[in-house]
Structures are given as C-alpha cells and as structure tokens.
C-alpha cells in the first residue's frame, strides 16, 4: 500500500466521521427540542420589612363626585390629560393608538368605537361613560375592569380626576 492510497483511506474515514457528526447534530436539533422553560419578563427584588404595630390605618372616605365636579378646573385637566396622549388621541374620529380615541367620551357607550379591539374586560361592561363611571375607571382601571389591557395605574387625587373629566367634556365644544 502506497502513501497515496493510505491518505485516501484516512481522508475517507475522516470525511465519513464528519458527515456522521453533522447528521447527529441536525437530528438532535430536529428531534430533541430545547424544553427549558424561559423566564419571561423581569423580577423585582422586594425587601421584607418589619410590620409597624403602631401604624395608623388610613380609611379612604367615599368621594362625593358631584361636589368634586363643582370645583373642577378644565385647564388643570388639560395638563393631566397629556399623560393620556401617549396611548390615546383626542381628535374627532382620530386614529386609535394603543387605546381608542377619547373624542366625545363623556356620555358615549362603553366599547363603542367599532374599529378598535377592546379587551374582554371592557367589552363586557355595558353602559355609558358618565361622570361616576369615568371617575371609578380613571381612579384605578385595573379595579374597575379586572383584566383590562390598559396598563395605566390610575389617578389618585379625586380633584385631578374631576379636572380630567371636565376637560374631556369641554374638549368636544372647543374643536
């Protein structure tokens, strides 16, 4: 056997080994998928704190919406509504962004914009967006409509909510 023939035999063995490794690698990918569960999102580390036994409990009294609405300020509401414009439009028949447009929302039926896909939580509500419903929704959307896709945490101050509602009522007449 000459050196040339020996080289051919060794090359054939190496080539066959390489092909076998490639076939094994591809077969593992196709028939043994990675079943590892991915952790989605992110975690927030929360420190445990000791419970203060001397803490006072703050009881939130019900808000008299008609009284708060009497002192509402539409100009202040205009400033607060700027937060809403990231996801909503105020224009008449304006485009739906992440949320539906807010033109003429006060007095409008809930989930009534036909070209917007509402979450199941909002679409099953029924009724109209009057002062009381808007007040409750703007205070804490996730409590008013559990399962809503609106990620806004809410407006904590009753006067700010009243200002926003008055602005939305008046905005229809401004345009």
Curated annotation (Swiss-Prot):
Query: What is the protein's membrane topology class?
Result: Single-pass type II membrane protein
What UniProt keywords apply to this chain's record, in alphabetical order?
Cell membrane, Electron transport, Heme, Iron, Membrane, Metal-binding, Signal-anchor, Transmembrane, Transmembrane helix, Transport
InterPro entries, per the entry? Cyt_c-like_dom, Cyt_c-like_dom_sf, Cyt_c_1A/1B
Topological domains on the Periplasmic side lie at 30-175
Subcellular localization: Cell membrane
The record's principal subcellular location, in a coarse class, is: membrane
Record PTM text:
Binds 1 heme c group covalently per subunit.
The chain's Cytoplasmic topological domains, given as residue ranges, are 1-8
**Transmembrane domains' residue ranges:** 9-29
| Entry-linked PROSITE patterns | CYTC (PS51007)
Where, by residue number, does heme c bind?
84, 87-88, 150
Tell me any Pfam family this protein matches: Cytochrom_C
Q: Name one GO molecular function term.
A: heme binding
| UniProt superkingdom | Bacteria
SUPFAM superfamilies xrefs: Cytochrome c
Any one GO CC term of the record: plasma membrane
User: What does the protein in this record do?
Assistant: May be involved in electron transfer from bc1 complex to aa3.
User: So what family is this one in?
Assistant: Belongs to the cytochrome c family.
Question: By its UniProt entry, which PANTHER family does this protein fall under?
Answer: CYTOCHROME C
Protein's recorded name: Cytochrome c homolog
According to its UniProt entry, this protein's organism is Rickettsia typhi (strain ATCC VR-144 / Wilmington)
Q: What is the lineage of its organism?
A: Bacteria, Pseudomonadati, Pseudomonadota, Alphaproteobacteria, Rickettsiales
Q: Which gene encodes it?
A: cycM
